[in-house]
Amino acid sequence: GQAQRIKVACVGNSVTYGYGIENRETNCYPAQLQQMLGDAYEVANFGHSGATLLNKGYRPYTQQEAYQKALRFAGDYVIIHLGLNDTDPRAWPNYRDDFVRDYLSLIESFRKANPRCKVWVCRMTPISHRHPRFKSGTRDWYWMEQALIEEIARIAGATLVDLQEGLYDRPDLLPDALHPNAEGAGILARTVYGALTGDYGGLQLPAIYSDRMVLQRDQP
């Protein structure tokens, strides 16, 4: 019989969905990731534009159909990239104390759906200073969130993936200051591919390992 394909759930907001990308179905980061991983994997896009991580945000991910579909999919690998929409005056100032708890309960819900699943938590893609909201406090909130996301990965025993690094000095790949174009989505796909497989393909990105992982490579 045919071996079971490894199911990869890409959970997120408009960046995962592929908002603004030409030929989104083939060029969004989950679709490009599918191309890289090949037939042994089934990658599914559960991105929802405008979704907040915060359950009291203005568009909570956990209240979207994409979330219910992701739970039913019960991915073996779950990649979560949320938080950009929480850097909003409607969300962060009022509800930031819920961020860690809401994130941990989201992770837990995927582990309930598939107790064997592995979870990757993503540092957020950049918001360019050209973004209209950037000066309102969003910039400071963004960095507060990045630090919390690192903490969340540690507490949850999930692996951290840095989606900021590859796009940080490439504002040209963020035409509207927030959403990556197809080339930018390709960088995200390569970064996630590296995190899932340990193969960074010559892409010099810092590999960030969770406390639970032991690096064998440097052992004598």
List the predicted regions and their residue ranges.
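Residue-level detector of flexible, active-site-proximal loop/helix-junction positions
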Residues: 15, 50, 126, 167, ...
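Conserved SGNH/GDSL esterase-like catalytic core that processes O-acyl groups on lipids
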Residues: 5-9, 15-104, 140
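Alpha-helical cap/lid subdomain in secreted, periplasmic
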Residues: 61-198
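Non-catalytic, glycine-rich low-complexity segments
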Residues: 201-220
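Low-complexity, Pro/Thr/Ser/Gly/Ala-rich linker/spacer regions in secreted
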Residues: 1-4, 194-204
